[in-house]
Regions:
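Bacterial N-terminal signal peptides
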Residues: 1-9
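Short, low-complexity N-terminal intrinsically disordered segments enriched in polar/charged residues
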Residues: 13-57, 166-167
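A solvent-exposed, acidic/Ser-Thr-rich amphipathic alpha-helical stretch
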Residues: 51-103
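Solvent-exposed loop/turn segments at secondary-structure junctions
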Residues: 70-72, 114-115, 152-156
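A short, structured loop/turn motif at beta-sheet edges
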Residues: 99-107, 139-146
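A short hydrophobic beta-strand element
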Residues: 104-116
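Exposed beta-sheet edge and beta->alpha loop/turn motif
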Residues: 113-142
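Short beta-strand edge/turn micro-motifs at domain boundaries
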Residues: 131-159
Length: 167
């Protein structure tokens, strides 16, 4: 009898997924694609030293980097801003420690290492090695990066560069 009832229950189930399941699957796929694109772009830009990856294929034309000194807006300005990391650190190494997302938002925890052997935002080479950790909040739309805001310990960066006052 139990097998008969179980058989009726199974046969009466709708094998078609609910709209809620379809929407959830679509959302998971979007987040996964955003994370993959974002990770690929920054690996190529910094580790691959290919600043030209910052282009209209991967970034919104009005890409914005929110900084303490004011927003950096547009592909060319954004590219020039991040190129400072390549000119300042010829051995730059960028690793994403962790990354996760929800909807159009991505959060990455990162590590940046390198030897300061070139001009870095107007700071002449110090020859010092840095090992910096930080977090970036990212907004994506339509499979493109729209906005970024980096958070890291500026005092730690300046200390590692030997640019803080000694006590």
């Amino acid at each position: 009898m139990f097998i008969f009832i179980l058989g009726i229950a199974v046969l009466s189930c709708d094998p078609k997924p609910s709209q809620e399941c379809i929407d959830l699957s679509s959302e998971i796929s979007k987040v996964k694609n955003n994370i993959e694109l974002y990770s690929m772009v920054w690996d190529k830009a910094i580790n691959g030293r290919n600043i030209e990856i910052i282009n209209l294929d991967n970034f919104d034309e009005n890409i914005k980097a929110i900084t303490a000194d004011g927003d950096i807006v547009g592909i060319d300005a954004f590219k020039a801003y991040y190129n400072n990391y390549l000119t300042g650190f010829s051995d730059a190494e960028f690793n994403i420690v962790d990354v996760f997302g929800q909807g159009d938002k991505v959060v990455k925890h990162w590590n940046f290492k390198g030897t300061h052997d070139g001009d870095f935002f107007g700071i002449p080479a110090t020859g010092k090695k840095i090992d910096l950790i930080g977090t970036t909040l990212v907004l994506m739309k339509g499979g493109k990066i729209v906005q970024e805001q980096d958070f890291f310990d500026n005092y730690s960066l300046l200390s590692q560069l030997g640019l803080t006052p000694t006590e």
